[in-house]
Amino acid sequence: MTNKTTNIQATGKYVRLSTAKTRRVLNQIKGKKYQEAILILEFMTYKPCKIIKKILESAGNNALNLKYEKQNLIIKQAFANDGPKLKRFQPRAQGRAFRIQKPTCHITINLSIN
């Protein structure tokens, strides 16, 4: 007898957020039910919450396309990996320039059926 688990995934790439700050929010929703995670993200005040909520809703809609109900979904995995850094220069005194690196990250959320 094979126990086949369905993997539903949504990814946000090149998101203009810090990986560390994004992971702080993702750790709060790992292992939670879909509806509970949406509520948590709505009431948290961190910047990544809005984007993570959009990615989570996208994963939920992917589940609907596969004929699964959102009430039965659990967040199996949620992780953020480093993306490329945007390099900018800021003018400083005496003709110098300081390099500013603006981080990006790739956010992936995997859902499974309860």
Curated annotation (Swiss-Prot):
Name the job this protein performs: This protein binds specifically to 23S rRNA. The globular domain of the protein is located near the polypeptide exit tunnel on the outside of the subunit, while an extended beta-hairpin is found that lines the wall of the exit tunnel in the center of the 70S ribosome.
Q: Which GO terms describe its biological process?
A: translation
Top-rank lineage group of the source organism: Eukaryota
Annotated GO MF terms:
rRNA binding; structural constituent of ribosome
Q: Which SUPFAM superfamilies does this UniProt record tie to the protein?
A: Ribosomal protein L22
A Pfam match is Ribosomal_L22
Annotated Gene Ontology cellular components are: chloroplast; large ribosomal subunit
According to its UniProt record, where is this protein located?
A: Plastid, Chloroplast
Q: Which family does it belong to?
A: Belongs to the universal ribosomal protein uL22 family.
Assembly, in brief, is: Part of the 50S ribosomal subunit.
Give the lineage: Eukaryota, Rhodophyta, Florideophyceae, Rhodymeniophycidae, Gracilariales
Give the species this sequence originates from.
Gracilaria tenuistipitata var. liui
Q: Which InterPro entries match?
A: Ribosomal_uL22, Ribosomal_uL22_bac/chlpt-type, Ribosomal_uL22_bac/org-type, Ribosomal_uL22_CS, Ribosomal_uL22_sf
Keywords, ordered alphabetically:
Chloroplast, Plastid, Ribonucleoprotein, Ribosomal protein, RNA-binding, rRNA-binding
Q: Which Gene3D superfamilies does the record cross-reference, listed alphabetically? A: Ribosomal protein L22/L17 (3.90.470.10)
Question: What name does UniProt use for this protein?
Answer: Large ribosomal subunit protein uL22c
Q: Where does it primarily localize?
A: plastid
Q: Which gene encodes it?
A: rpl22
